[in-house]
Amino acid sequence: MQKRFFSIVASLVLMLGCALGSFAQGTSRYNIIPAPAKLTPASGDYVLSRQTTVYAKKAEDVAQLFVDKINKATGYDIKLSKKQQAGGITLLLDKSIQGKEAYTLTVTPNGVTAKASTKQGLFYAMQSFLQLLPPAIESSIATQAPNGWKAAACTIEDAPRFEYRGTLIDVCRYFFSIEQLKKHIDVLSMYKINNIHLHLTEDQAWRIEIKKYPELTEIGAWRDTENGRYGGYYTQEELKDLVKYAEERFINIIPEFEMPGHELAAIAAYPWLSCREEKVIPRPIWGIETIVMCPGKETTFQFLKDIVDEMVQIFPSQLFHIGGDEAPRDEWKTCPLCQKKIQELGYKDEPGSPKEAKLQSYVVCEMEKYLNKYGKSIIGWDEILEGGNLNKSAIVMSWRGDNGGIVAANAGHRVIMTSSQGGLYVDYYQGDPAIEPQGIGGYAPISKTYAYNPVPKEVHEKGMDKYVMGPQVNLWAEYLPNNDMQDYRLYPRLLALSEIGWTPNEKKNFEDFSKRLDSDACLRLKEHKVNFHIPLPEQPYGSCNYEAFTDENTVTFKTTRPEKMVYTLDGSEPNANSTEYTAPLKFTESATIKIATLLPCGIMSKTRTVKVDKQTLSPATEAPANLKNGLRVKYAKGSYYKVEDLDFLTNWEEKEIKHVRNLGGLTQGDYAAVATGLVKVEKDGVYYISSNVIRAWIDDQVVVDNNNIACKTSRPNGRSIALKAGLHKIKVVYFNVIMAGRPASWSGSDVLFRYGKDGDFKSIKPEDFYLD
């Protein structure tokens, strides 16, 4: 009886362990991303060895990709077997499995069996199997697994929640090489992403060779920057090779050809495409261009059709993106040809639907009909809904929040959800902007991406879920000038997209996802040489690398997801054995904190250096006689990018201004300006300074230093300083130039003050600036 009792208890414990294991994967044995729909743990491991055999009937190409990968990492010479063998790995096509991407995977100590009704399903089964092996299986050179090439035994029954799981890659603002795109394809396919939306045409560049219109790449692929001519393009053969590479990994490449807006690069090559036919250049700055294509000309439509004729020969995708977003229609209002076309079509203004919006809808519908002849379905940004008359076959990509997707799905359109408000714009900041690389703005930490549900409740409540094809993250490239930055923005948020697109919503668990990410997936990304984002230690009151104090100072750190932090106070670089941060650090003397995030897998973030500086209050300056409000400014015309450029200038002009905000607009064109004067502070204490100017000083101490930073956005990059109440010297350097596509005027020239660590940064009142 006692034996039977213990047997029952043991069985219950095993059952409970299996049940918990199927939900909480974040252990050393099961770290698959995206989490499978159903995973049942089992005891033991399958061991990959030189004697392992791989058999695949009618799926040899999938099996060969798998074999090539494991041979490269292990140094083995495994070959495909002509027959199924005991103890081997078997891939079988089984038509009884429902769903083209569904699969089953059975891993035991005695063998591995993957089944699916399609090769794509088998490919995904093997991606899951690879994630059961040590992360070093992703190595590009032969290596060793310290504990052997073991895969934890389990049974998986899996299928995706959504048919569409996508990533937009913008190759126009900055050019991605074919090699970089292939690297992304390798990683995306690991995580069961099945669509790349390739953004090929823009105001800033045209990236695809079109043989009928050679000047699109001769002129349109290149733009002028402060560093000279920049650009590049893909030949048709290069793109065909890329498409083939992606198809082998079951990724569909969807081309985007913007129309009628975002096409200044094409208009630069062929000015007759616009209403005014003026000679222009590819747009050297970011933002929305007001010059768009002219739909009043039949030659414009012929151009669009000619481009499509060549693009469909390169991209076999059944989906074709025609853009349609951010197309200002102002020129159409005064263009005789556009107005004539509107009259011919009988369009009139209606509430919420001006006739020019209907003209844009006409462009969409005409091109949809043309693409339909090739068997293509169009995708357009959610603005294509605005003119009405949109065919039900058109797919709407909802980017301005969820509303476009809600309206479209409830009207019977298929939709792809890529909400800029839902964490799916991965060019947004994923940590405190004060310490993160320059970005376009916004805030989308990985927790926000992971929390997104592609089916809005307004769609679900009406039973229209079936119209939601799935989610997509968008990697816009305005602030991604190199491969490292492209990686940094996309990963690991791409893995969160993978899970929200694949895993059943009720099985999502961010804590468990984070464990799988931090303990396993990050090692796999490292093997692919991906420069992924690791949360940096941040100060919750606003990160600052230079904290002044007068008596004592407490410095607090956090991370955007719970991670271990380690630090030193002796000037040395922190490592895995350094002191763990567990509570706020208190200081009564000056010190230097070096602090970094340490992931469970042993990978560390870059080090933050935070100086805490004990200061006496900087004394106030005695007020000059005849105190007068304002600032003195000297400015010199020309393009300057570093403070050192000013050392030898002699062409200064002088004037007075009322506020540092007035440093913009001093004169036409590029110029440098230096403002000097006095600023009044109301009370004794430590002040934190924030500004986007090049450099600023208070009482001859540098408090802002953005010198030689290429991309400026509204982010603090300042210090703190202890000041006595009263007047203090201030000096500000401002460059009115375009840096890496961003005019300085967009960021402004204000200098903001915050008293202490609490509260908000505020602009100084004009009456608190004085001439010195």
Predicted regions and their residues:
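Bacterial N-terminal signal peptides that target proteins for export
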Residues: M1-A10
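Active-site neighborhood of glycoside hydrolase catalytic domains
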Residues: I281-P284, I288-K392, W399-V407
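Short, compositionally stereotyped local motifs that mark structural "simplifiers"
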Residues: A24, K508, S514-K680, V686, ...
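Short beta-strand-plus-loop segments that form exposed binding edges in beta-rich domains
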Residues: V732-G741
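Feature activates predominantly on carbohydrate-active enzymes
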Residues: Q98-L319, C335, E366, Y370, ...
